[in-house]
Amino acid sequence: MTSVLVNDQDRALSFYTEKLGFRPALDIPLGQYRWLTVVSPADTGGVQLLLEPNIHPAAQAFQQALHADGIPATTFAVDDVHSEYERLRALGVEFTGAPAPAGTTIAAALDDTCGNLIGIHQLTAR
């Protein structure tokens, strides 16, 4: 399991499932928040992504600083970054720019609507 801080769990669940294509995994009520995870449909027994409520002031400052500096909170590997970029743009997802070479990858960053930039990248060399 890994996590990403989100400022709205309901909006995050919608974005990560309806736009990015994850599947809901766990949804356990915890007071006013939830233990809310999603998983890749390609590996439903694989790594879960916890949509963690961003309630601590230090976490909020960290998230805001990353976003302001254009740094993705996390990055997902894709087979074809250009196709994924076009697919997501057609769904209304906003990017900071078009895919561009970055070392041994081609990468792009999108706004997850929950306070984060999320990277997508395609490995071009090993």
Give a label for each model feature.
Residues 65-66:
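Short Gly/Pro-enriched turn/cap motifs at secondary-structure boundaries
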Residues 41-46, 55-58, 81-83:
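Short, charged/polar surface micro-motifs in flexible loops or helix N-caps
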Residues 69-73:
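Eukaryotic phosphotyrosine signaling hubs
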Residues 47-49, 118:
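Short beta-strand segments
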Residues 4-47:
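Core segments of cupin and vicinal oxygen chelate
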Residues 1-4, 25-26, 34-37, 76, ...:
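Vicinal oxygen chelate
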Residues 40, 53, 122:
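Active-site donor-binding loop signature of nucleotide-sugar glycosyltransferases
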Residues 33-35, 57-62:
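A short, acidic/glycine-rich surface segment
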